[in-house]
UniProtKB/Swiss-Prot annotation:
Substrate binds at residues 229-231. The class A beta-lactamase family has a specific amino-acid numbering system, sometimes called Ambler or ABL numbering and often misspelt as Amber. A multiple sequence alignment was used to derive a consensus sequence and then the consensus was numbered taking into account insertions and deletions. This allows use of identical numbers, e.g. for active site residues, despite differences in protein length. UniProt always uses natural numbering of residues, hence there appear to be differences in numbering between this entry and some papers. The active site is at 65 (acyl-ester intermediate). Hydrolyzes both carbenicillin and oxacillin. It comes from the Bacteria. It holds the Pfam family Beta-lactamase2. It catalyses: a beta-lactam + H2O = a substituted beta-amino acid. Its EC number is 3.5.2.6. GO terms for molecular function: beta-lactamase activity. It comes from Pseudomonas aeruginosa. Belongs to the class-A beta-lactamase family. It is an enzyme of class 3 (hydrolase). This is Beta-lactamase CARB-3.
């Protein structure tokens, strides 16, 4: 954790990685695209030297639950500005429950703090908790306005859970690009958008994610750390955004998005694992 925080003020200029360095990754991604009849976008940003590589990095993909990191970052930002109190409570009503709410569905009739709602959102991907946060930060428009404020001109949020997960081809609503969201995560975790205290809180929520054990975490190199957030939606949408680092490796921001495929969830998960393994091999092979 200390190593990650050491880079909290570092946002280097982007330098495009040599094509040869990521040649195998690109070949692997293309092979998976063909095998799943999918559309895939990937971006990799090394925060130490600004080295950047992508595959379909400027194409739009459904945000799905990867928006939750941004929504909770907006809550932290608003708290810094005195616009919201993260310790304020919201009553949980049965009528507000939406699909997949493993934490909130057990607390109907009780109250939850906004801070705890973010914890549930980020660690279990609880959709009702996410809607509670959205309501507190000005809705989808509030999140999109925040993105524009920090320089992200591509990512947009238009709907709440669960509608935002529709994933229909050609629909610009609730989409991002792998390149844009990697840059945004860089600003949120290592830039000046949030205070160091809130950067640590956002990082902690991502580190304690409980629903991604079968994705990048399953092939994380020994001694490495990860902070991540995943998502899934209609028309084969599956995604993950992550920061990985080790004692000797500066944080690397990875975003992987799949869309427009009839592949099963297991097949999509396996695709993310294979792509992640290929990316990690680029960095571990350098230290051999």
């Amino acid at each position: 954790m200390k190593f990650l925080l050491a880079f909290s003020l570092l946002i280097p200029s982007v330098v495009f990685a040599s094509s040869s360095k990521f040649q195998q990754v690109e070949q692997d991604v293309k092979a998976i695209e063909v095998s799943l009849s999918a559309r895939i976008g990937v971006s990799v940003l090394d925060t130490q030297n600004g080295e950047y590589w992508d595959y379909n990095g400027n194409q739009r993909f459904p945000l799905t639950s990867t928006f939750k990191t941004i929504a909770c970052a907006k809550l932290l930002y608003d708290a810094e500005q005195g616009k919201v109190n993260p310790n304020s409570t919201v009553e949980i009503k049965k009528a507000d429950l939406v699909t997949y709410s493993p934490v909130i569905e057990k607390q109907v009739g009780q109250a939850i703090t906004l801070d705890d709602a973010c914890f549930a959102t980020m660690t279990t991907s609880d959709n009702t908790a996410a809607n509670i946060i959205l309501s507190a930060v000005g809705g989808p428009k509030g999140v999109t306005d925040f993105l524009r404020q920090i320089g992200d001109k591509e990512t947009r949020l238009d709907r709440i859970e669960p509608d935002l997960n529709e994933g229909k081809l050609g629909d610009l609503r609730d989409t991002t690009t792998p390149k844009a969201i990697a840059s945004t995560l860089n600003k949120l975790l290592f830039g000046s958008a949030l205070s160091e205290m809130n950067q640590k809180k956002l990082e902690s929520w991502m580190v304690n994610n409980q629903v991604t054990g079968n994705l990048l975490r399953s092939v994380l190199p020994a001694g490495w750390n990860i902070a991540d957030r995943s998502g899934a939606g209609g028309f084969g949408a599956r995604s993950i955004t992550a920061v990985v680092w080790s004692e000797h490796q500066a944080p690397i921001i990875v975003s992987i998005y799949l869309a427009q495929t009839q592949a099963s969830m297991a097949e999509r998960n396996d695709a993310i694992v294979k792509i992640g393994h290929s990316i990690f091999d680029v960095y571990t092979s350098q230290s051999r």
